[in-house]
A protein has these predicted regions:
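Nucleotide/phosphate-binding sheet-loop regions of phosphoryl- and nucleotidyl-transfer enzymes
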Residues: 1-187
């Protein structure tokens, strides 16, 4: 994932980086281990407008409890800034468990919430960082760290979307999401 890419020159360079990733050590080792022919692999590069989660929050949600496999709960993680810190495991996020049936019936459905330390956040940067993106990681001030990064209303809205996505695909899902800090919408 290459974030905060601007203009045709940066987009062209980013696409080249994505295509070159087909031939990095990890990709080659994976194909060898899976006995997948190198000449049969395909790759595409998706380009989309950046959600301004650097001014909001982001995270990952699972349509089951990842520890127990319990399928009647949705597990949501959330932290400030771009989602890469959660995906990479470099931040201790807030965690929420939502009961699907309670949500469906219109009851308060948040089973538990745990305040993460959220010590760092990834935001847009002006210069290319070491991971080929225009981002930087910075400390989160103590006042923000002591607050949940999502309201209960936002947690339940995410959980509703997770249930719709799971129903569409017919099996448990792992879903990345973002809260735009400008328009306050969940994506």
């Amino acid at each position: 994932t290459l974030l905060n890419v601007h203009g045709i020159d940066q987009i062209t360079a980013a696409i080249k980086i994505v295509f070159a990733s087909l031939y990095n050590d990890r990709a080659i080792a994976y194909r060898v281990h899976q006995k997948f022919p190198h000449d049969k692999v395909s790759l595409s590069a998706g380009i989309q407008k950046m959600v301004r989660s650097d001014l909001g929050a982001s995270g990952v949600m699972f349509t089951l409890d990842t520890e127990s496999g319990f399928r009647d709960a949705i597990f949501i993680t959330a932290a400030y800034g771009l989602g890469e810190t959660i995906v990479q495991g470099t931040v201790n996020p807030d965690e929420f468990y939502v009961y699907k049936r309670g949500l469906t019936l219109g009851y308060p459905a948040i089973l538990s919430r745990r305040l993460g330390t959220k010590a760092i956040e990834m935001v847009y940067g002006d210069k290319k960082s070491t991971n080929d993106t225009f981002t930087l990681t910075r400390n989160v001030d103590v006042e923000r760290r002591m607050r949940f990064s999502l309201s209960d209303t936002q947690v339940e809205a995410l959980a509703r979307q997770a249930m719709i996505i799971e129903q569409h695909y017919g099996h448990p899902m792992d879903i990345e999401w973002a809260l735009d800090g400008l328009d306050k919408q969940l994506y």
